[in-house]
A protein has these predicted regions:
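Generic L/I/V-rich hydrophobic alpha-helical segments across diverse proteins
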Residues: 8-11, 15, 34, 38-41, ...
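Charged, low-complexity interaction regions
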Residues: 20-28, 46-56, 71-80
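Short stretches within intrinsically disordered, low-complexity N-terminal or propeptide regions
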Residues: 21, 35, 43-46, 53, ...
Length: 94
């Protein structure tokens, strides 16, 4: 299993956690999970061969969804946050 596949799986599992717990977890827990997803994306995108990776598009989709979800979380709009997460998961699956 390659490094980018591991990054994708870590990000995907974090986003699944977020999708299932947007309403019942404290804001700090959600911020930590989003931070983990974003940090993993940052590390993956800094890799030398990221541009040639087949996981480039899914990682970018999850990173964009996490960034949008963070903005909605900061505004207190958890339902929109969940929608962004689900949209990103759907885009990453294609």
């Amino acid at each position: 299993m390659g490094i980018y596949q591991l990054c994708y799986l870590k990000m995907h599992s974090g986003m699944l956690f977020l999708a299932g717990h947007t309403e019942d977890k404290e804001k700090e827990t959600l911020l930590k999970a989003l931070s983990d997803v974003m940090d993993t994306a940052r590390k993956a995108m800094a890799g030398k061969s990221f541009a040639r990776s087949p996981y480039r598009a899914p990682i970018a989709a999850l990173a964009a969804g996490a960034a949008a979800a963070l903005a909605y979380l900061e505004q207190g709009e958890r339902e929109k946050m969940r929608e962004e997460i689900l949209t990103a998961l759907n885009a990453a699956a294609k």
